Amino acid sequence: MTSSLKTAFFFVYSQKIYCIMDNYQIRKELYDAASLYAGFDPADENSYATCYDGHVYADFVASGKRSRDLAVTLPRTLHDHSISDALYRFLGGYDPYNVVGVMGGHAMKRSDASFRNVALISKRLTEHGKLMVSGGGPGAMEATHFGAWMAGRSDAELDEALQMLLAADTFRDAGWLSTAFRVMERFPQKQFRSLGIPTWLYGHEPSTPFATDIAKYYDNSIREDTILTVAVGGIIFTPGSAGTIQEIFQEAAQDHYKTCDVSSPMAFMGVDYFTREIPVYPFLEDMMARGKYHDLLLSISDNPDDIVREILAFREADAVHIPNKFFK
C-alpha cells in the first residue's frame, strides 16, 4: 500500500468492485479530543453536528448501525482493526498491572456525590502511576477521566473545575461538551494520561474529551471486552444498570478462568447499591463460598480512600507473573 494511492483498498465481491478510502476510516494512532472533535467550537454547541465525531455518527446511523452492506461493514472493520492496533501499541508502554478500569453507568450526574468520589479515586490512582481506563462516555466514565485530567493539582482545584462542569449536569443538558472543553482550557494537562474506549453504537452519548487517548470503535462488543482484558491492575465497579451488571459477570468469569493468567481486583464502590439495590456482591461472595467461583479478589466500600488502597495493594509480586503479551 503506497501513500500515492491514498492507501486505497480494492476487493471484488459479488461482481462489484469497491474502493474503500481511508480518509477517515483507517487510523495510525488513537484519537484525542482535538482529532475526535475537530471542527467543534465550544462557543457554539450546534457545531457538534459538523465536527468529525458528529459527522461519523450521522453516517453510522444513516448507513445502518447493523448494516449488512459489505461496502459499509468493511470500512468499519478496517477502522476498528486499526484502532485495536494503535491501542495495543499505546499500551505497550505500560506495565499491565498499572492499567486500571472503571465501569459504571452513563446516568451518573456531575452533581452526584459519587461523581466526585470517582474523580477523586481516579485522580489518586493516576498520581500513583496508574493508567485509568473507562468506556469513555458520560457519567461515571467522564468522572474517571475528569479525575485523571486533574491529577497533579489540588483537591480544591478539582472542586473548582467541578463547579464549572455543573453548568450542564448531564450529557443531555446543553453545554455538557462545551463545559468540559472550558475546564480543559482553564486547567491544562500535560503530564498525565488516561484511556477512553467509547463506541459509536452509543453515539448519542458523547465521548468525554477529558480522556487524553481515545480508542473509539464501531463494534461495541470489541470495546467492552477490551476494557476488561487490558485492566489487569483491577476494575472498579460503580453504580450502573444492565450494562454494568453484565460487565461484572464478564470480569468474574475472566478472573475465575484466569483468562489473562491472573485474577485482578474487583473493587465495588457503593455498599448499599451493590448489596441491597442490585445485590451482586453478596451473590459473588456466596458463589465463592460454594466453590462456583475461584480466586475472585472482591472488596466493597463507600470510601474513595479504601478503594484506592485496595487497588494499590495489588502488586505484581502477589500474583502470577504475566508477560506483556496483550500489549504487544
Residue ranges of model-derived segments:
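Short, charged/polar "capping" segments at the starts of alpha-helices
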Residues: 7, 110, 204, 273-279
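Short acidic, glycine/serine/threonine-rich loops at helix termini
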Residues: 113, 144-148, 207, 247-250, ...
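C-terminal functional extensions of proteins
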Residues: 227-229, 263-328
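Short, acidic/small-residue loops that bind anionic groups at enzyme active sites
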Residues: 129, 156-165, 238-239, 245, ...
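Glycine-rich beta-alpha loop segments
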Residues: 1, 11-178, 183
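Short, solvent-exposed amphipathic alpha-helical segments in soluble enzyme
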Residues: 118-121, 212, 250-255, 282-286, ...
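Acidic/glycine-enriched connector segments
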Residues: 139-237
